[in-house]
Design a protein with these regions (language model features):
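Short, charged alpha-helical interaction segments and adjacent helix-coil junctions
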Residues: 1-6, 13, 67, 76-81, ...
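Upstream accessory/linker segments immediately N-terminal to the RecA-like ATPase cores of bacterial MutS
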Residues: 145-146, 153-167, 171-172, 176-183
Length: 279
């Protein structure tokens, strides 16, 4: 795991800490948005790591990295993403579809008309090419297949920004911002605006509260990793005991006793383990 000093703005912890910071939050979020959208943005309320829960324990919820609410305007969600696994990339459009659905559902209260739904722009900033065309900007909106020129305005828009894309003649300021987000050093702060952003990033990294939060997140990830390793070791031991016992022709009663002895568990737990490997 990187140290806090080593983090770049494309790391979700840092961009979340920056945009939610009590001093630098709104101005940093505004600069990033205005650079991406190339227009002015109104007063912003930043909701770091906004949660939209599932309807019940059986349904999926989401956690949004940087949720931005423009006063009397649009809703924005900024999602830095470095998870370049094949399955994750293929499912990205469906993931975005779900994000839009949850954001809309969370902002339409009882009695509201559908016409009152606010415009929502979900922005993914990725260090991988989500569609393989080497474009820096992919802007996605719903439309009509039969009549492409038909104006179909449902208020939903998604922008994928590939930090290393070259095709499509992206604006120079956007190229510089995305390069800085992936490599957040003073050497890559090539404009006055980026130098100002870098000063904010540096100040946030030196903030004691941010450092404490990062240390806690590091400890939490370490606990999860160790727990996963322990569970994996235990599962491997369970399977090994059962497979070896079967090879040696041992009866289930003998295997149960061996499981209890080796794993320090009671008979009921041993039976559950044995049943698991008989399925």
């Amino acid at each position: 795991m990187k140290t806090l000093e080593e983090l770049n703005l494309v790391d979700d912890f840092l961009v979340n800490s920056l945009t939610s910071h009590k001093i630098y939050g709104e101005q940093s979020a505004r600069y990033i948005l205005e650079c991406i959208l190339r227009r002015q943005i109104g007063k912003l309320t930043v909701v770091p790591q906004r949660f939209f829960c599932g309807e019940n324990t059986e349904t999926h919820g989401i956690r949004l990295d940087v949720y931005l609410d423009e006063e009397n305007g649009e809703i924005f969600d900024i999602e830095p993403d470095q998870n370049d696994g094949k399955e994750e990339i293929v499912s990205l459009p469906r993931r975005v579809r779900f994000y839009h659905a949850k954001i809309d559902a969370g902002n339409l209260t009882a009695g509201d008309t559908y016409g009152s739904l606010r415009n929502v722009i979900v922005i993914f900033i990725t260090t991988y090419d989500p569609f393989g065309l080497n474009r820096m900007v992919y802007t996605i909106k719903n439309g009509c297949i039969e009549v492409p020129e038909l104006e179909y305005e449902d208020g939903a828009q998604t922008i994928f920004l590939y930090t290393r894309g070259r095709e499509g003649n992206p604006p120079e300021e956007l190229k510089q911002l995305l390069h800085y987000m992936e490599h957040s050093s003073i050497e890559n702060a090539s404009t006055e605006s980026l130098k100002k952003l870098h000063r904010m990033v540096t100040a946030v990294k030196r903030d004691g509260e941010v450092g404490l939060a990062y240390m806690k997140s590091f400890e939490r990830e370490e606990r999860i990793r160790r727990q996963g390793e322990e569970e994996g070791r235990k599962a491997g031991l369970e399977e090994g005991i059962i497979k070896l016992s079967r090879k040696l022709g041992k009866e289930d009663t003998e295997i149960l006793s061996l499981l209890q002895e080796e794993l320090q568990i009671d008979e009921e737990q041993a039976k559950l383990i044995l049943e698991k490997y008989q399925q």
